[in-house]
Amino acid sequence: MTEPNTPAAPTGQAQDDNQIMAERREKLAALRQQGVAYPNDFCPTHHAADLHTRYSETDQPALEAANVEVALAGRMMLKRVMGKASFATVQDGSGQIQFYITRDRVGEDVYAAFKHWDLGDIVAARGVLFRTNKGELSVQVQELRLLSKSLRPLPDKFHGLADQEMKYRQRYVDLIVSPETRNTFRARTKAIASLRHHMSDAGFMEVETPMLHPIPGGAAAKPFITHHNALDMQMFLRIAPELYLKRLIVGGFERVYEINRNFRNEGVSPRHNPEFTMMEFYAAYTDYRWLMDYTENLIRQAAIDATGSAALNYQGRELDLSKPFHRLTICQAIQKYAPQYTDAQLADANFLRAELKKFKIDTNAPQFLNAGVGTLQLVLFEETAESQLWEPTFIVDYPVEVSPLARGSDTLPGITERFELFITGREIANGFSELNDPEDQAERFRKQVEQKDAGDEEAMFYDADYIRALEYGMPPTGGCGIGIDRLVMLLTDSPNIRDVILFPHLRRED
């Protein structure tokens, strides 16, 4: 018996899609006349991948003796008709398996109908497992049905969707034809499941906080604005859940976390999407040092659970998450990757402003209204060192003026107990010991309002209710946010954040 490895004759390549669709609609019309266009009474008992796993070592004599009866359904991806016998490769949600279809077993009428079925059709079969002469596990079909007619032709099997934007716009087609895309989103699910599992093991409670905020807060970002008709008030899609999660710490839940969407009305890039997924978690009686240790272990374990290893390959370069993550201050990172800068220069605000002009940074912009040396150092770090942080690196000791929610250092004036984690030159996580002094927090909010009044659209609003919550007393707390999309990019070797978001936003089709 011969096995197929090629699709049906490429008639679709010589015809435009409209003609193909017209022909398929005629076939659908005939099915409607027969009253069997879209049946819904077939229940699969098995999945392809499970069968391949379970019977991977079972030879044909053993399969014949076992008489393994199966019922499977899926999309027909390959088809080869050879007289009285045919082969079809069917793809279900787990993988692919081959059907062996003969006229004698399924009957002349069904076999004749099968010849006119198209690639992309959803089909179902009952039969028994066997191995072909070449050793491929297959289903010897005894009953065959068409469950759903595909009206649009699939892309060429060898090239898939060549247009990258079309992959994003028609993700459903991309998922049909690309096993790599399917594996990416399976890995995403595994990574998130890993995070949830380990958060639960550590005593964290998963919660849900509002997506509509009366005051945007928790991050420096430009919000999306909407209107609540029933309350007749302006609302904002949340830019971060932070202030609500810390209200829960005040309320007595000592360890909380949330995995959900944030929205920031800002630019789109290979690492930025206006709608993205974050995990934020807060633990009472911890600080930023504890957070760094915990975050490191969390990410390492997510890699193992999602990919099977902490040793990754990202865009052609090796990356080993099993090694201890590096820890550097902002100035240490600058001097590591731009050693021409001296300690004295990095402490000189005038020098830093002049240096930043070389990078075309406008230090007279509103966001630099209250910029001290620390802020200028941070911007220089972003220009000289950030993109070079390939190995996992915690950058610590952020200036207070860019960390309005972080606790100040007890030993370093103007510095906060804050870190950001960078891997492959991208920020993956941001965390800090939380500011729980209501008077200090109120003053920092006031300074943020000054920056906003001066034109800084990303400066924070004054949140009086959050101050009121802090006035009841919040225990010492550490909090961290992990970018799920960027983490999945790392774990799946994806160069663009849109590769790991099922339906990223795109411009309207013309």
Curated annotation (Swiss-Prot):
InterPro entries the record matches: Aa-tRNA-synt_II, aa-tRNA-synth_II, aa-tRNA-synth_II/BPL/LPL, Lys-tRNA-ligase_II, Lys-tRNA-ligase_II_N, Lys-tRNA-synth_II_C, NA-bd_OB-fold, NA-bd_OB_tRNA
An MF annotation (GO) of this entry: magnesium ion binding
This enzyme's EC code(s): 6.1.1.6
GO CC terms of this entry: cytosol
Cofactor dependency: Mg(2+)
Protein's name according to its UniProt entry: Lysine--tRNA ligase
Main localization (coarse): cytoplasm
Membership in a protein family: Belongs to the class-II aminoacyl-tRNA synthetase family.
GO annotation (BP), single: lysyl-tRNA aminoacylation
Catalytic activity reported: tRNA(Lys) + L-lysine + ATP = L-lysyl-tRNA(Lys) + AMP + diphosphate
Quaternary organization: Homodimer.
Cofactor note: Binds 3 Mg(2+) ions per subunit.
Annotated compartments: Cytoplasm
Keywords: Aminoacyl-tRNA synthetase, ATP-binding, Cytoplasm, Ligase, Magnesium, Metal-binding, Nucleotide-binding, Protein biosynthesis
Residues bound to Mg(2+) 2: 427
Enzyme class: ligase
Binding sites annotated in the UniProt record for Mg(2+) 1: 420, 427
